[in-house]
Amino acid sequence: VKAFADSRPDADIVYGAWNFIGPDGEIQRAMKALPYSLNMHIWYGTYLASTALFLRRSTTIEEGFLLDERFHYDMDGEYYARLGRAGKKFVHYNRLLADFRWHGDNLSAPNIERRDMDAELKRQKQHGEDAAIKRIYGLSFSKHSCNNIMDGFMREAYRMKKAFLYLTTPWEK
């Protein structure tokens, strides 16, 4: 990764593919890294893994771009949106770079099966952070109902774009 980053001095962020690892230590699936799109990131959601993403300290952290600790579920998503909005260059390194262990204790792990107040409050807090990213870094209408319609439309549009990119982006493991 260092050699690639050194060969790309224009890169503020270098990222690549990763594996999801289950609680049993087995690979559940490999995740292909796709070209970065700020709008796809805002409207679809975070699709870059922090475990497979490297920051150039001199053009990010040392310039004051730090994590916003007010976010608990989508801290990476807000950070990447802020870096993208600031014009930082995300460079796709088309290699498998990391593993991400998925287990029930992950803060952002979904609680789809659970139907209790704690699980529902957690889901709503996650959605609230996602909505804040859309309102601050994306578009916003004064009518909340218009934002909901736009959010649904834009998410589906970028979900289709992501599917297209997944099919057409080459991948070297």
Q: PLM features: residue spans?
A:
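Residues within well-ordered alpha helices
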Residues: F4, T59-I61, K122-R123, I133
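Soluble, non-transmembrane catalytic domains of enzymes that act on hydrophobic metabolites at membranes
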Residues: S108-E120, Q126-A132, I136-F141
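Membrane-proximal basic amphipathic "stem/tether" segments
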Residues: G128-K173
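A general structural signal for alpha-helical elements within enzymatic catalytic domains
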Residues: A5-D6, G84, R135-G138
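Conserved nucleotide-sugar donor-binding catalytic segment
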Residues: G16, G22-P23, R29-R115
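Glycine-rich, phosphate-binding/catalytic loops in enzymes
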Residues: K2-A3, K32, M117-D118
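Conserved donor NDP-sugar-binding/catalytic core segment of glycosyltransferases
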Residues: V1-Q28
